Amino acid sequence: MIFDMSNRLGAGAVVFTLAVLIGCQAKAEATSAAADISVEEAEPATLGSMDEQYAWVGDLGDRDALPGKPLYIEHCAGCHEAQVYKAPHTTWLELMSPQVLYRSITEGIMQSQAAHLSGGDKQHIVEYITQMRLGDPDAGPAVAWCEGSASEFSTLDENHLTGWGHDTRRYVSSDAAGFDRSQIDNLELKWSFGFPASTRARSQPTIAMGAVFVGSQDGTVYAFDLETGCVRWTFAARAEVRTGITLGKRGPEGIPTAYFGDIIANVYALDAKTGELVWHTSPDDHHSATLTGTPAFANGNLYVPVSSLEVVTAANPEYACCTFRGHVMAVNGDDGSVLWDSYAIPNTPISTGDTAAGTKIFAPSGAPVWTSPTIDVDRNLLIFGTGENYSSPADQNSDAVIAVRLDTGERLWSRQTFPDDAWNVACMMVDNPNCPEEDGPDYDQASSPLLVDIGAGKSVVVAGQKDGRVFALDWETGQNKLWEVKLGRGSIQGGVHFGMAADGTTVYVPINDMNDTRNGEWLDPETARPGVSAVNAVTGEVLWTHVQENVCGEGRPFCDPGVSAAITATDGAVIAGHLDGIIRIYDRNSGEIIWSYNTTTPVTGTNGVIARGGGISGSGPALGAGHMVINSGYGLYNHEAGNALLVFAPKATGSVSAR
C-alpha cells in the first residue's frame, strides 16, 4: 500500500520530523534580524540521549514498546550496533524507508541473515528501526507510466550537461537553460510529483535526453518525461539516493549512462535509456560510510567523494571513536573498477589513548568529503574540501582544501582553512567522554570549491566554509590567500552549505545563519544575515547582499529564512531555494528578488500523490531545455519535511521542446 501523503503532509496533519545530529526540541526559532525572540528569552538545549535524535511524531508511538525491539536486539544489533565493516550502523538504518529495509532482508543483501525469521518478525524489525508502518511491501512506486512518444529518449547532448557532476560552478547559460532573464517573470508550475511516504527530497535533479533523472528517499531512481511528468523507468537502489544523477557516455559506443550513489555508500551505473543496472560497487566498507556528494564524470571515469556519519555513532560513549577517513575514489565508468583512491588523512587511525569511560580513542579520523569534487581536465586537476576531524588529536587535513592529480590521485597540495577542529555529536551532550578535547567548532568545507577564471590566463580556487567565510586561493599551490570575506556568523548549521555558484568572475554565496545552533547556544538575532551575496572573485569585493527577513510566521518551528541548498546561476539571475520553502530568483546585478514561489503550497502530483514542499536543502535548482526543476523537503536536522519534485517553465512559450 502506498502511503497517502495528503494525510501525511496536509494542513493539520501529522508530520514526521527526524532531527539527526541537531536534536529534536520543537521550539520557536529566531532566525533573522527581524525575529521577535531575544537572546535572553531563548532556551537553547543540548542532546540528552541518542534517542532524542530520532524523535518521530507520527505512525508509531513509544519505540521501546514496539514488538520489533527484542527481535532487533537478538538478531541484528550484534553487527549493526558494533563496528562491523560492511554492516551499516543503526544510525543509517533509521534513515531508510521501511520498504527499502524490508526489501533488503527479503530479497536483497541481508536475505540469508534473515532467512530464519518469519514474515511477521521481519515486519516488526523494520517498523521498530524506522518507526514507520511498512504497508504493502509488494506495492511498486505510485507513478503514471509513459506511453508512446513520451517514453522515448532523445540524444544525450554533452554540451548541455551542467552543474554537479560536470561543473561545480553551477552556471547554466541561457542557451542550455532554454529560457532567458526576460522570461523568468513568466515561470509557472508545469507539473509536480509527490514522492510517496517521504519526508525529504534532496537528490539533485538532472535534465537530459528529454527527461528528468532524480533519486528519492525510498531508494527509487526515476526517469520522468520532461514535458508531461510521466515515468519512463524506475530503479530500486539499496537505500536512499541523495546524490545527484550524473550523466555520461560509456564505452566506445558512447552509451548514455546514469551514475549515482546511495546513503550506505553504494555506487551504481545504469543504462540511462532503460534503467537497467550496468554495474554496482562500494567505495568504502566502513559501517558508517555514505555518499552525499554527487560523483563527477570526466574522461570516461567517475570520481566519487566519500563521507560518513561516524560523527553520529560516536555519541555512544561505549563506541571506540573513530576509524573513518574521508576520500575521493576514481573508478572506471565502463565497469566500476578502481583506478585510484585519495584519502584526506593519508594514514590509518591508530589508538591514541582512552576516554574517561575507558573507551579506546583512534586518531586522526574524519575529514569527510561532503560535496562534489571540482575537476579541470586540461590542468589534470581535481580539488575537494574536507570536514572536521572526529577525534583527538586533530590533524592538518580537516577543514581543508585539497588538490590531487586527476590521473593518479597523487596529492599536489593541501591548505587547511580552520585548524584544531575535532568534533562529533558527543559534544552536543553534557559530559559525554567521546567529545574530543578540541570540542569543535565543526567548521567544514561544506561547499564544493570553485575554480574560477579571473582573466589574463589566471584562475583562483574560491572556497566557502561553515564559519561564514569565503576566500580565494592560488590554484597551483593552495597558498597565497588572495582575499577573504566573512558573510555569515558561522555555527554547526551556519555559514556556507552545499554549493556556491559562479557566473564569470562573480561568485554567488548562499548563507545559512540560524540563531538556534541546536548546540546549546543561541546567537544574537540582530546579527543574523541569512540569504545570498555576490562577490567579485578577482578582488573579494562584496557586490551585493540580500538578507532575507523571516516570513515563517507562527506554528512553523522548523522554518528558517537561510539558504542551505546549493544555488544556480544563469544569465542575468541567480536562483536559491530557502529553508522556508520559498524559491527566490535574484537579479544578478542588484540582488533584487525578481520571482518567487512557495513550495509548501500543496499540489497534486502526476502520480496522484499530494506534493508539498518544505525546507529546501542540499540539492539546488536544475535548468535545461526550457525548464527549471527543484526538489523541496528536508525533514532532517530540524528543517521542514516535504516530498515535492516541482517542474516550472515559462508560460508564454507554451510547450517547450526538450533537448
Question: Where do the model's predicted regions map?
Answer:
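Surface-exposed loop and turn segments in beta-propeller and other repeat-based domains
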Residues: G194-F195, S282-D285, D341-A363, L412-G440, ...
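Blade/loop signatures of beta-propeller domains
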Residues: C146-L189
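Repeat-blade elements of multi-bladed beta-propeller folds
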Residues: E158-G165, S198-T220, A239-V267, T290-A320, ...
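Beta-propeller blade signature
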Residues: F324-G336, N397-E410, A528-G540, N643-G654
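Electrostatic cytochrome c docking/interface patches
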Residues: V39-L71, A142, S149
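The canonical Cys-X-X-Cys-His
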Residues: G68-Q83, L101, I125, I129
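Extracytoplasmic electron-transfer domains, predominantly the class I c-type cytochrome c fold
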Residues: I37-E41, A87-G135, N631
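Short loop/turn segments that connect beta-strands within beta-propeller blades
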Residues: D225-T228, D271-T274, N332-D335, L406-T408, ...
